[in-house]
């Protein structure tokens, strides 16, 4: 029976009840889910959460080693611009899918719907687990950076202080526990908290940019770097060509910009979701890309010595850069602002991760899913999922004791896992779904949809292997210098594949609908081009 056709066996009262639903609830019902959360996010507050997850200032500080250290200032200026054009293509394609299918399952749900007949469960399985790796490694990677910067402040005050791994671990754990408590609060409180978090992020970012421009040249006689130096002089600290080093530097851009999917996962808590959520996605990527480029310009024109910043014993390139440009008190002040932004960023990551985890638990992906999918009756938030992610994040932080190379792999995993998850449904949409089989939402790209999709997919196909390349090769590629991304990402994904073929393919049938077909909505609100069989799994949705 098609879910876009009315059933002759359906009582009129059922349709009357459904037509009385708010538009957002009706759209969600059309996708097979009943309303569980309170819709207290707007386009602005959804943007605030995703911009907090983006955390431009702490994200840049955390990934400066990749963005600047691989190829120097050219990677910061025109390299960032090149990467952002294609990152925006991915964001645009995601926004179009979000407008059509505004569920917290997001990319995972879209992959199940758009995959060819018989491949829906497998597509959803891989997309879901890859996206979960993005979400669950986000909070610990941010917490690790947060802890590192706090201890760097101690080192600035006392140069004889030596940071110990257990200190980083305990600070990171404390941060995630605090963020877990905040993320367990009601949606309305989260909206207010993240609004203020975004305001502070923007304010502190502006303060840092204005300050470094104002003080440039006061500590050293060089003043601003020349245009030729900034745009043309590579400082290649890899064993690869300048072009390859430039592509490898995109890892910092991709990781920094990987938070724009958050509005998709918050769409079930957003009013006017089919319009507000995709707008928030595009706003986050576009605004983040532009402001991030301006931040890069400020640093590129004021940095004194790229090589010294990357290789200083302090181990924090951004703080070393500030020390090159500013006096002690200003360096401490700007680093402190970055630490505060980092905490806000980690909290946004925790919220987004909990919503993704809930959507998967609702569909029975995890062991003990029925317990994980419990929504707190008082706060109307998935608090069990929040604390599961806190526990997993703490386990990820144990990599701190395995060495810097192991814990740093989390950053690369976030980039590559995000790209795989973000682009899989876009790939399916572009190559396997005809235009007349896909019902666009109110936000769409029109005739540019396919072109945008081709550009996004081509960029991802290029970047996925490059993100696995080590900085050095030959005898210089020691275990400590090795890029372990292929292991840290490939290992879990290999286990997921084995799990699929051994067991999951027998019981996982894709996203489970929590509302019956006859309880859905009238034909105008339903995703076209699919039909549903008698079981309640979207994996049985087929093209007409």
UniProtKB/Swiss-Prot annotation:
Keywords: Amino-acid transport, Membrane, Transmembrane, Transmembrane helix, Transport. The chain crosses the membrane at residues 41-61, 71-91, 106-126, 166-186, 196-216, 240-260, 280-300, 332-352, 391-411, 413-433, 451-471, 484-504. It comes from the Eukaryota. Disulfide bonds: none annotated. The keyword Transport applies. Belongs to the amino acid-polyamine-organocation (APC) superfamily. This is Uncharacterized amino-acid permease C584.13. It comes from Schizosaccharomyces pombe (strain 972 / ATCC 24843) (Fission yeast).
């Amino acid at each position: 029976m098609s879910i876009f056709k009315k059933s002759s066996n359906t009582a009129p009262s059922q349709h009357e009840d459904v037509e009385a639903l708010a538009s957002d609830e009706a759209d969600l019902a059309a996708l097979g889910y009943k309303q569980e959360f309170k819709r207290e996010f707007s386009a602005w507050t959804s943007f605030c959460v995703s911009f907090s997850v983006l955390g431009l200032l702490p994200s840049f500080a955390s990934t400066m080693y990749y963005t600047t250290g691989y190829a120097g200032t050219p990677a910061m200026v025109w390299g960032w611009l090149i990467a952002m054009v294609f990152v925006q293509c991915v964001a645009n394609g995601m926004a179009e899918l979000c407008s059509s299918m505004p569920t917290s399952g997001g990319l995972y749900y879209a992959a199940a719907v758009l995959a060819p007949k018989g491949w829906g469960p497998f597509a959803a399985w891989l997309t879901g687990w890859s996206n979960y790796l993005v979400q669950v490694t986000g909070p610990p990677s941010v917490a690790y950076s947060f802890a590192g910067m706090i201890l760097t402040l101690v080192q600035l005050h006392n140069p004889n202080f030596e940071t110990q791994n257990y200190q980083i671990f305990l600070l990171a754990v404390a941060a995630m526990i605090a963020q877990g408590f905040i993320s367990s609060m009601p949606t309305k409180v989260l909206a207010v908290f993240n609004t203020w978090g975004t305001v502070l992020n923007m304010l502190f970012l502006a303060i840092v940019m204005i300050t470094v421009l104002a003080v440039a040249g006061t500590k050293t006689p060089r003043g601003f770097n020349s245009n030729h130096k900034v745009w043309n002089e590579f400082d290649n600290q890899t064993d690869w060509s300048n072009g390859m080093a430039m592509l490898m530097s995109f890892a910092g851009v991709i990781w920094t910009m990987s938070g724009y999917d958050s509005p998709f996962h918050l769409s079930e808590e957003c009013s006017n979701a089919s319009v507000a959520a995709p707008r928030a996605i595009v706003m986050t990527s576009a605004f983040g890309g532009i402001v991030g480029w301006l931040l890069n310009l400020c640093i590129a024109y004021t940095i004194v010595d790229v090589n010294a910043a990357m290789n200083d014993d302090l181990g924090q390139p951004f703080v070393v850069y500030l020390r090159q440009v500013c006096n002690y008190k200003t360096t401490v002040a700007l680093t402190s602002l970055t630490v505060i932004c980092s905490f806000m960023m980690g909290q946004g990551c925790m919220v987004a991760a909990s919503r993704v985890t809930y959507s998967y638990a609702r569909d029975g992906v995890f062991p003990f899913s029925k317990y994980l999918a419990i929504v707190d009756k008082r706060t109307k938030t998935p608090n069990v999922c929040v604390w599961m992610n806190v526990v997993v994040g703490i386990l990820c932080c144990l990599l701190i004791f395995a060495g810097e190379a192991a814990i740093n792999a989390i950053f690369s995993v976030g980039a590559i896992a995000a790209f795989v998850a973000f682009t899989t449904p876009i790939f399916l949409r572009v190559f396997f779904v005809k235009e007349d089989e896909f019902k666009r939402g109110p936000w769409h790209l029109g005739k540019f949809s396919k072109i945008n999709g081709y550009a996004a997919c081509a960029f991802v196909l290029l970047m996925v292997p490059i993100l696995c390349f080590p900085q050095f090769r030959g005898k210089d590629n020691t275990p400590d210098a090795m890029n372990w991304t292929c292991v840290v990402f490939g290992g879990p994904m290999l286990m997921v594949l084995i799990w699929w073929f051994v067991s999951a393919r027998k019981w996982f049938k894709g996203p489970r609908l929590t509302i019956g077909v006859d309880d859905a909505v009238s034909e105008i609100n339903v995703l076209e081009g699919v039909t549903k069989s008698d079981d309640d799994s979207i994996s049985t949705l087929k093209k007409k």
